[in-house]
Design a protein with these regions (language model features):
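Conserved functional hotspots at enzyme active or ligand-binding sites that engage polyanionic ligands
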Residues: 1-140
Length: 140
């Protein structure tokens, strides 16, 4: 990528994530930028989620978000929000495209689940008025 390239949240790039270890995604693959645009401007790294074309495996997993094949994305893919990664900008190969605002909202929901900011079961219980009593862990 050009030295003065400006990375944006929601951009999709082809990047080299290095050697895959175990179930961790690696190699050259598409990634979506999750980091805020201020960090994208100043930092030598970007926070990304890798994409996979193996979309049938665990398709309904709450940390996955499906992206249909579109301009810049040759095949339908799954965003793997459970595999958030910090990628040095020197590992970015080329720009592929950008997700829509609606798609970014869906990806954000998957990231919230991964980081524990949103737990689907608790949200459903709250919606149905079945909230559990809060537990005080300090013995009180």
């Amino acid at each position: 990528m050009k030295e003065n390239w400006v990375y944006r949240r929601g951009d999709i790039y082809l990047a080299n994530l290095g050697v895959p270890i175990g179930s961790k995604q690696g190699g050259v693959r598409p990634v979506v930028v999750l980091q805020n645009d201020v960090g994208n401007f100043y930092s030598p790294t970007i926070t990304v989620a890798p994409l996979t074309t193996k979309i049938q495996k665990k398709r309904n997993q709450p940390t996955h978000y499906f992206l249909r094949k579109a301009k810049g994305l040759a095949r339908s893919s799954m965003v793997l929000a459970e595999q958030l990664d910090t990628c040095d900008k020197t590992c970015v190969i080329r720009y592929l495209g950008k997700v829509s605002k609606g798609q970014m909202r869906g990806i954000d929901e998957a990231v919230k689940v991964q980081l524990g900011y949103y737990i689907p079961e608790q949200a459903e219980e709250k919606r149905q008025g079945k909230c559990r009593k809060e537990v005080n862990f300090d013995g009180g």
